[in-house]
Protein backbone atom coordinates (compact mmCIF):
# COMPACT_ATOMS: atom_id res chain seq x y z
CA UNK A 1 0.00 0.00 0.00
CA UNK A 2 2.72 2.48 0.93
CA UNK A 3 4.66 1.55 -2.19
CA UNK A 4 1.64 2.32 -4.35
CA UNK A 5 1.21 5.74 -2.72
CA UNK A 6 4.91 6.55 -3.13
CA UNK A 7 4.80 5.57 -6.80
CA UNK A 8 1.79 7.83 -7.38
CA UNK A 9 3.49 10.73 -5.58
CA UNK A 10 6.69 10.20 -7.54
CA UNK A 11 4.78 10.35 -10.82
CA UNK A 12 3.19 13.65 -9.78
CA UNK A 13 6.55 15.02 -8.63
CA UNK A 14 8.13 14.06 -11.95
CA UNK A 15 5.40 15.98 -13.81
CA UNK A 16 5.81 19.04 -11.61
CA UNK A 17 9.61 18.86 -11.96
CA UNK A 18 9.28 18.98 -15.76
CA UNK A 19 7.21 22.16 -15.55
CA UNK A 20 9.66 23.75 -13.12
CA UNK A 21 12.58 22.93 -15.43
CA UNK A 22 10.91 24.70 -18.34
CA UNK A 23 10.24 27.75 -16.12
CA UNK A 24 13.83 27.85 -14.90
CA UNK A 25 15.06 27.94 -18.50
From Swiss-Prot:
UniProt keywords, alphabetically: Cytoplasm, Ribonucleoprotein, Ribosomal protein
Pfam families in the cross-refs: Ribosomal_L41 (PF05162)
Region of interest (Disordered), residue spans: 1-25
GO annotation terms (biological process): translation
Molecular function in Gene Ontology: structural constituent of ribosome
A GO cellular component entry from the record: cytoplasm
Location(s) in or outside the cell: Cytoplasm
UniProt entry tagged with the keyword Ribosomal protein: yes
Oligomeric form and interacting partners: Component of the small ribosomal subunit. Mature ribosomes consist of a small (40S) and a large (60S) subunit. The 40S subunit contains about 32 different proteins and 1 molecule of RNA (18S). The 60S subunit contains 45 different proteins and 3 molecules of RNA (25S, 5.8S and 5S).
Entry similarity comment: Belongs to the eukaryotic ribosomal protein eS32 family.
Misc. comment: Initially thought to be part of the large ribosomal subunit. Crystal structures show eS32/eL41 to be a small ribosomal subunit forming a bridge at the interface of the 2 subunits.
Main function: Component of the ribosome, a large ribonucleoprotein complex responsible for the synthesis of proteins in the cell. The small ribosomal subunit (SSU) binds messenger RNAs (mRNAs) and translates the encoded message by selecting cognate aminoacyl-transfer RNA (tRNA) molecules. The large subunit (LSU) contains the ribosomal catalytic site termed the peptidyl transferase center (PTC), which catalyzes the formation of peptide bonds, thereby polymerizing the amino acids delivered by tRNAs into a polypeptide chain.
Protein name: Small ribosomal subunit protein eS32
Organism encoding this protein: Candida albicans (strain SC5314 / ATCC MYA-2876)
Gene designation: RPL41
